[in-house]
């Protein structure tokens, strides 16, 4: 179960949202208990159908409440409080009604106020919870920023992943993480990779030991995070092993946390410049993401020439 708590949310967002703690305890848990629930579902405008959410009350909700009888408002607030929401936030520079302060105080539900608009508060907290409560996985490999694309380099031990990363860094690309990469699914089709705090800025290369990339190459050689767009697998061919297709009709993909990611296999052999090949794979992927497929262009040109049409000049 993925979870955080109100205290951590308050500390992380207190300055950004100018939150003021009015009453209640901060120890209540915010958690994702089912796979079908997204972290963004855990917060929203005042909602009696989903009372267990983190509830946001803006000017519109408070204006509606003022038009209702005290008994009706007391009944609805009791329904919400009985569902034990993590917290209630009053936005739009509004003052929380006395009845709300009393109920939250008695039930130990955290009550906050903020001068920011309710919609802005919801957007900011949804983004925060989506990252904090996202699905996560740690994978072995090297994560790089190559030409602005997040590239995850994989391969068996001794395949040359760290050496390749070092060469790419010397060519102006950036290191995100070496050895262990933490990937988070921050949106239905978006994977974000980061480096564990212990390994940040470091890379281990056989024969050289541990190197601090930020110290050696400067600030621009390291990245804090990147979106994963391509997996490059380094593979040493064994005698008799079948070579991959020289003209693949479809790009291979690899699933990470249920999200398909484009995958390229680069055979490793003496004399091959893997850094140049990886850069070419990245450039090809960028073109494909823009709808340009070089393989399909070649097939279409071949078909036109077979049909008697003139080729390009």
From Swiss-Prot:
Question: Which cofactors are named for this entry?
Answer: Mg(2+)
Q: Region Important for the catalytic mechanism of both phosphorylation and dephosphorylation: start and end of each range?
A: 203-212
Alphabetical UniProt keywords: ATP-binding, Kinase, Magnesium, Metal-binding, Multifunctional enzyme, Nucleotide-binding, Serine/threonine-protein kinase, Transferase
Instruction: Kindly list the positions annotated as binding Mg(2+).
Output: 162, 204
Query: Which reaction is this enzyme known to catalyze?
Result: [HPr protein]-L-serine + ATP = [HPr protein]-O-phospho-L-serine + ADP + H(+); [HPr protein]-O-phospho-L-serine + phosphate + H(+) = [HPr protein]-L-serine + diphosphate
**Region described as Important for the catalytic mechanism of dephosphorylation:** 267-272
Q: Carries keyword Ribonucleoprotein?
A: no
InterPro entries in the record: HPr(Ser)_kin/Pase, Hpr_kin/Pase_C, Hpr_kin/Pase_Hpr_N, P-loop_NTPase, Ser_kin/Pase_Hpr-like_N_sf
Which Enzyme Commission numbers does its entry carry?
2.7.11.-, 2.7.4.-
Q: Where does ATP bind?
A: 155-162
Could you tell me which Pfam families the record lists for this protein? Hpr_kinase_C, Hpr_kinase_N
Catalytic residues of the enzyme: 140, 161, 179, 246
Highest taxon of source:
Bacteria
Citing just one GO molecular function, the answer is:
ATP binding
What are the BP-aspect GO terms?
A: regulation of carbohydrate metabolic process
Comment block on domains = The Walker A ATP-binding motif also binds Pi and PPi.
Do you know which PANTHER family this protein is assigned to? HPR KINASE_PHOSPHORYLASE (PTHR30305:SF1), PROTEIN YJDM-RELATED (PTHR30305)
Family from the record: Belongs to the HPrK/P family.
UniProt subunit comment: Homohexamer.
Extra notes?
Both phosphorylation and phosphorolysis are carried out by the same active site and suggest a common mechanism for both reactions.
Q: What does this protein do?
A: Catalyzes the ATP- as well as the pyrophosphate-dependent phosphorylation of a specific serine residue in HPr, a phosphocarrier protein of the phosphoenolpyruvate-dependent sugar phosphotransferase system (PTS). HprK/P also catalyzes the pyrophosphate-producing, inorganic phosphate-dependent dephosphorylation (phosphorolysis) of seryl-phosphorylated HPr (P-Ser-HPr).
Q: Which HAMAP family match?
A: HPr_kinase
Name the record gives this protein: HPr kinase/phosphorylase
Q: Supply the source organism for this entry.
A: Aromatoleum aromaticum (strain DSM 19018 / LMG 30748 / EbN1) (Azoarcus sp. (strain EbN1))
